[in-house]
Amino acid sequence: MELYLDTSDVVAVKALSRIFPLAGVTTNPSIIAAGKKPLDVVLPQLHEAMGGQGRLFAQVMATTAEGMVNDALKLRSIIADIVVKVPVTAEGLAAIKMLKAEGIPTLGTAVYGAAQGLLSALAGAEYVAPYVNRIDAQGGSGIQTVTDLHQLLKMHAPQAKVLAASFKTPRQALDCLLAGCESITLPLDVAQQMISYPAVDAAVAKFEQDWQGAFGRTSI
């Protein structure tokens, strides 16, 4: 199982990489724009924040296959082993095929349906990213889409992995993992929620209180 953070916040990545067993960091154009740092600045910073380890993902901006390939080459000039995110449009599928032929790893993104995701894997994408919460927001079932996609990839494109994205709650992420999803990417707020349990803090405080009462200190 691979756990990623979906952010361009360098400080947060450095802090959470100390706590979480991170496989890397994913970004998209909206995330990069919100951080107001250009790719050639923020991507090396994110790489350094992870201690020079882990996989980085960044997305193309062009809308034609040829343009997407050119964008991919630009991204690879910044981070040599970056995974290139390509929207799974008709042109995106063509670009994924072209990048596969060049040995450049890709992630098929903006996936709203299992069939769409399967096509990106068959075209050569190493990862496929269904948008769980956005599918729910459109009246679908994000978890069912992940379940269906996982089964399709297992049967027809076992070399590819589901990398589920677009979460609003930890429960959505856990349901994806229970459905067999091999990897997830979490926004910072959801990642923080996974380690924020008021009942745990209360339990630790009670342990300290009892120990202090018995031994007059809080150390062993």
From Swiss-Prot:
One CC-aspect GO term: cytoplasm
Identify the domain of life.
Bacteria
State the PROSITE patterns in the record: TRANSALDOLASE_1, TRANSALDOLASE_2
Chief location of this protein within or outside the cell: cytoplasm
Could you tell me the Gene Ontology terms of the biological process aspect for this record?
Answer: fructose metabolic process; ketone catabolic process
Q: Which Pfam families match?
A: TAL_FSA
Q: What else is known?
A: Is not inhibited by EDTA which points to a metal-independent mode of action.
Q: State the function annotated in the UniProt record.
A: Catalyzes the reversible formation of fructose 6-phosphate from dihydroxyacetone (DHA) and D-glyceraldehyde 3-phosphate via an aldolization reaction. Can utilize several aldehydes as acceptor compounds in vitro, and hydroxyacetone (HA) or 1-hydroxy-butan-2-one as alternative donor substrate. Is also able to catalyze the direct stereoselective self-aldol addition of glycolaldehyde to furnish D-(-)-threose, and cross-aldol reactions of glycolaldehyde to other aldehyde acceptors.
Listed name of the protein: Fructose-6-phosphate aldolase 1
Q: Highest lineage ranks of the organism? A: Bacteria, Pseudomonadati, Pseudomonadota, Gammaproteobacteria, Enterobacterales
Encoded by which gene? fsaA
